[in-house]
Regions:
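An N-terminal assembly and electron-transfer interface module characteristic of large anaerobic redox
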Residues: 1-295
Length: 295
């Protein structure tokens, strides 16, 4: 049985359930790196180049931690999931950067997910990964279908139940009990909010103080997309709705304040942050921007 390593960083928080189902249905054993700690962070910082943002450095650290634990590494290159909407260049280039900066890594499986190239290219990329494990096209088709169903179930649980990715992955289907009516929206990409080491446990700390915390994942993708379009029109950045859409949605529905967290040096986030801050000032909603790096 082939053991596949999945780094617990970046797109793990959006797609891990689907990846796990897909790989296991193909007969692979999935191993996930441990939650981020000082050792993982230091390993990633040592491998990252100067202009690499904190989340990508953390990702490299997770790959290093998995080197001796798996036969292959799963690092998709997610380029685009919608028309003329693109991912950050560093996330697009993750597989190539990982190969260059971590030469001791086992082989990297890097399907290109680029909806701009059409459905045929997407299928060819996914089936190319599947052929690494099986030559049975029916087994591969079932794995794809079950992975997609798992992804829909995962997103539905978070928005319907009002729970976080960590709760959904751990099958804790009830939101944290918090009688407080004081509500703070914590707006950030999941790989920042739910990595408790680099976020300094921001969400648990707020909940400990009796604050009701709401996040982008607790809103349906359709509502986030609609809110994004109301504020800026057609989105151009992949996952733009996690920042702009969530900010607009929660400002419209009513929160007592917003904490918006980003990685220092992130170009796309710096533009999105400015838009949300401007909108919050218009509506007189308190907003606290936090910028994170490895120092």
């Amino acid at each position: 049985m082939v053991t596949v390593g999945i780094p617990r960083a970046l797109l793990y928080y959006q797609y891990y359930p689907a990846w796990k189902v897909f790989l296991e249905k193909l007969g692979a054993k999935v191993v996930v790196s441990a939650p981020t700690n000082k050792s993982i962070l230091n390993s990633g910082v040592a491998r990252g180049v100067q202009d690499t943002c904190l989340p990508v450095k953390v990702f490299f650290g997770h790959i290093v931690s998995l080197v001796d634990k798996c036969d292959v590494m799963f690092v998709p290159a997610v380029t685009s999931l919608g028309k003329k909407s693109y991912n950050c260049s560093k996330l697009i280039g993750l597989p190539n950067m990982a190969r260059a900066l971590i030469p001791e890594s086992p082989p990297i499986l890097a399907p290109e997910i680029n909806c701009e190239k059409g459905r045929y290219n997407l299928y060819r990329s996914i089936y190319g990964v599947g052929r690494y494990f099986t030559s049975n096209p029916f087994k591969l088709k079932r794995a794809v279908e079950e992975a997609w169903a798992s992804n829909l179930d995962y997103r539905g649980k978070m928005s319907d139940e009002g729970i976080t990715p960590l709760q959904a992955i751990d099958c804790k289907l009830s939101p944290d009990v918090n009688p407080s009516s004081f509500t703070i929206a914590v707006i950030a990409h999941p790989y920042i909010s739910y990595d408790e080491y680099i976020s300094h446990r921001l969400i648990p700390q707020l909940q400990k103080k009796g604050v009701k915390v709401v996040t982008p994942e607790m809103v349906s993708p359709e509502e986030l997309d609609a809110a994004t379009r109301r504020l800026v029109g057609v989105p151009h950045w992949l996952f733009e709705s996690e920042i702009i859409g969530a900010g607009e949605y929660y400002m419209e529905t009513g929160v007592d304040g917003i904490i918006i967290t980003s990685a220092f040096g992130c170009g796309p986030d710096s533009m999105m942050l400015g838009m949300v801050q401007h909108r919050a000032r218009e509506l007189s909603i308190p907003i606290l921007p936090l910028s994170l790096d490895e120092h």
